[in-house]
Amino acid sequence: MPNIKSAAKRVEVTRKRTMRNTRIKSALKTTIRKFEEALKNASHDEARLKLRNAIRAIDKAVTKGVLHKNTASRKKSRLTKRFNKLTG
């Protein structure tokens, strides 16, 4: 338990940011999982839509400071590569 008021505030701010980051990362993982399921079903149009949603979610995570831009670029590249492999 912090004794100094500023330290107590930092604990609270950290807790709030952690919750926010966890929520954003969880939503990101869900969108990526939905894209992977669409790939397994070999539905080309659905997979394209899910890929667009996944890339949008990744970009939003970068904007909010949850992911580093290079990490996001790597994730987008891998997802796009998997989509292109399916479509030929």
Curated annotation (Swiss-Prot):
InterPro entries: Ribosomal_bS20, Ribosomal_bS20_sf. GO terms for molecular function: small ribosomal subunit rRNA binding; structural constituent of ribosome. It comes from Pelotomaculum thermopropionicum (strain DSM 13744 / JCM 10971 / SI). GO terms for biological process: translation. One of its GO terms (cellular component) is small ribosomal subunit. It holds the Pfam family Ribosomal_S20p. The keyword rRNA-binding applies. Residues 71-88 have a biased composition (Basic residues). This is Small ribosomal subunit protein bS20. Residues 69-88 are annotated as: Disordered. Keywords: Ribonucleoprotein, Ribosomal protein, RNA-binding, rRNA-binding. Binds directly to 16S ribosomal RNA. Disulfide bonds: none annotated. Belongs to the bacterial ribosomal protein bS20 family.
